[in-house]
Amino acid sequence: MPELPEVEVTKQGVSPYLIDNRVTDLIIRNPSLRWPVPDIAKQIIGQTIRAVRRRAKYLLIDTDAGTTIVHLGMSGSLRILPINSPVEKHDHIDLVLASGKILRYNDPRRFGAWLWNELPEQAHPLLAKLGPEPLESAFNSSYLLSALANKKKAIKLCLMDNHIVVGVGNIYANEALFAAGIHPQAEAGKVDAERISILVAEVKQILARAIKQGGTTLKDFTNAEGKPGYFAQKLHVYGRGGDTCTHCGQLLSEIRLGQRATVFCSICQQR
């Protein structure tokens, strides 16, 4: 599943082609995504794209008339292509631009979203209750320590809770907890301030590094040019259950936590 770095890489890739460009058509070949794709051709055709933003794992394409909200789901991708590019399987939506380019949405599993919003952002149900961005200053050790106070849930589940902090999905939660030396099942409210400070720093560093290296390639992710990311080569624990720890040589343990694969080192990550 594309996580925050993959969506940020996508945003950086498509933005130069979209901003200040005029929409000339919207082609919806298959409206059956996670939610039905609304027929917004009348609203968006003729509009100039003013900004492209990311909020959590949502890509927001702003015009004066409203905002297109895109979520890549489990397997979605956005690519910039010439207007006459052949349509391939799972190419569900084209946003056609006056420049002669198209923004094409491809999604084999169709669990992503392409929605339209004319409300204030804080009033939209998908965006209203999101926590701070992990790469911004609002996400700091003081904030996280306060947010986790008295919480009995496992620290990994809290780290993946979008009400606490957005965009830290399974891959990067595994990696950040390993880097901080925190057991994923540790009770969140009992993790001390020093460890929380280290965890915040590791979340920021790991996400920033993944963005710089182009996102993580596991199965489906490609960037806006159709190229894979390369951060998978740098993963220490995610997807490596049963392999040896890169720090101590101990075999890595794998469990299910919140129905997600969780890999950790029982030596390096103490409760």
UniProtKB/Swiss-Prot annotation:
Keyword 4Fe-4S listed: no
Signal peptide: none
GO molecular function, one term: class I DNA-(apurinic or apyrimidinic site) endonuclease activity
Cofactor(s) of this protein: Zn(2+)
InterPro entries xref list: DNA_glyclase/AP_lyase_DNA-bd, DNA_glyclase_Znf_dom_DNA_BS, Formamido-pyr_DNA_Glyclase, FPG_cat, MutM-like_N-ter, Ribosomal_uS13-like_H2TH, Znf_DNA_glyclase/AP_lyase, Znf_FPG/IleRS
Enzyme Commission numbers on file: 3.2.2.23, 4.2.99.18
Domain of life: Bacteria
Oxidoreductase among keywords: no
Pfam families documented for this protein: Fapy_DNA_glyco (PF01149), H2TH (PF06831), zf-FPG_IleRS (PF06827)
Protein's GO biological process: base-excision repair
ZnF segments: FPG-type: 236-270
Catalysed transformations (reactions): Hydrolysis of DNA containing ring-opened 7-methylguanine residues, releasing 2,6-diamino-4-hydroxy-5-(N-methyl)formamidopyrimidine; 2'-deoxyribonucleotide-(2'-deoxyribose 5'-phosphate)-2'-deoxyribonucleotide-DNA = a 3'-end 2'-deoxyribonucleotide-(2,3-dehydro-2,3-deoxyribose 5'-phosphate)-DNA + a 5'-end 5'-phospho-2'-deoxyribonucleoside-DNA + H(+)
Residues involved in DNA binding: H90, R109, K151
UniProt entry keywords in alphabetical sequence: DNA damage, DNA repair, DNA-binding, Glycosidase, Hydrolase, Lyase, Metal-binding, Multifunctional enzyme, Zinc, Zinc-finger
CC cofactor note: Binds 1 zinc ion per subunit.
Active-site residues, as the UniProt record annotates them: P2 (schiff-base intermediate with dna), E3 (proton donor), K57 (proton donor), R260 (proton donor)
NCBIfam families on file: fpg, PRK01103.1
Assigned protein family: Belongs to the FPG family.
Function per UniProt: Involved in base excision repair of DNA damaged by oxidation or by mutagenic agents. Acts as a DNA glycosylase that recognizes and removes damaged bases. Has a preference for oxidized purines, such as 7,8-dihydro-8-oxoguanine (8-oxoG). Has AP (apurinic/apyrimidinic) lyase activity and introduces nicks in the DNA strand. Cleaves the DNA backbone by beta-delta elimination to generate a single-strand break at the site of the removed base with both 3'- and 5'-phosphates.
Subunit structure comment from the entry: Monomer.
Protein name: Formamidopyrimidine-DNA glycosylase
Taxonomic path: Bacteria, Pseudomonadati, Pseudomonadota, Gammaproteobacteria, Alteromonadales
